[in-house]
């Protein structure tokens, strides 16, 4: 049975898609109802009053008809803002888009994921405020892996549990190996010690308690390459938004 309820909800606009000549399908990440697709009639008309409230990266409180299955509908925007810097800056936009794409891939639609709504909202706030977008994205990537069914031990050796020796990532062992056990996997990643330490921190720290982390461009790239490999070979996804960031990095060289 497809139940319908008129309700207020907190949401973040993930993306929009054209539907027919004048309509849009707009996907929201909501606090109360998970990821939902909303049908917005006449949204492409120039005089549509809610247009600014349904642009990508708009966020706030809305009211509408929430259907348990199929498309939902928005009646009004009650208190909506825009992540202005993300919306206007191509680099921030790219990382924020990738973060939202990851969440879209990790969870089914119409399933309540309140804790992840809160984390993603915090990530976007931090990115919009000028914090290191790549580090915030790495944190989300690493912590989302469990939601894809990938459990990795990041903070100690999977064989002996030691934390006092340099660690390196081993796909074969599903986590870190300490220096005493590196010979067990000749195909380990050969991470630099600082990269391994930063990954351990990002895997465990709450995004609500994340402070300033000073990381070199080389270290960030090493972490980025590792997560790309894990998502491609273990999760089985290679998002276009990641490829765009890779291309964007080449522009900076």
From Swiss-Prot:
Gene3D superfamilies: Nucleic acid-binding proteins (2.40.50.140), Recombination protein O, C-terminal domain (1.20.1440.120)
Keywords, sorted A to Z: DNA damage, DNA recombination, DNA repair
Keyword Secreted set for record: no
Source species, domain of life: Bacteria
UniProt GO cellular component terms: bacterial nucleoid
Biological process according to GO: DNA recombination; double-strand break repair
Pfam families (alphabetical): RecO_C (PF02565), RecO_N (PF11967)
UniProt function note: Involved in DNA repair and RecF pathway recombination.
Family of this protein: Belongs to the RecO family.
Protein name: DNA repair protein RecO
Source species: Pediococcus pentosaceus (strain ATCC 25745 / CCUG 21536 / LMG 10740 / 183-1w)
């Amino acid at each position: 049975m497809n139940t319908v309820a008129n309700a207020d909800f907190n949401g973040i606009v993930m993306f929009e898609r054209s539907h027919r000549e004048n309509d849009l399908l707009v996907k929201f990440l909501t606090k109360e109802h998970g990821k939902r697709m909303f049908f917005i009639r006449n949204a492409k008309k120039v005089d549509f009053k809610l247009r600014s409230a349904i642009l990508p990266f708009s966020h706030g409180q809305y009211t509408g008809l929430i259907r348990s299955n199929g498309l939902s509908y928005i009646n009004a925007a009650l208190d909506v803002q825009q992540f202005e810097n993300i919306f206007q800056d191509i680099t921030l936009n790219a990382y924020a888009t990738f973060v939202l794409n990851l969440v879209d891939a990790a969870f089914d639609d119409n399933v309540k994921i309140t804790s992840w709504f809160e984390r993603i909202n915090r990530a976007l706030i931090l990115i919009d405020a000028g914090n290191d977008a790549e580090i915030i994205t790495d944190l989300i990537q690493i912590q989302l892996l469990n939601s894809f069914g990938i459990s990795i031990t990041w903070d100690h050796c999977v064989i002996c549990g030691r934390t006092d020796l340099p660690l390196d990532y081993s796909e074969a062992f599903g986590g870190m190996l300490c220096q005493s056990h590196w010979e067990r996997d000749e195909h380990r990643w050969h991470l630099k010690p600082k990269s391994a330490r930063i990954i351990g921190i990002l895997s465990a720290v709450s995004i609500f308690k994340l402070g300033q982390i000073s990381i070199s461009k080389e270290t960030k790239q090493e972490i980025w390459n590792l997560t790309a490999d894990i998502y491609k070979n273990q999760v089985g996804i290679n998002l276009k938004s990641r490829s765009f960031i890779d291309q964007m990095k080449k522009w900076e060289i």
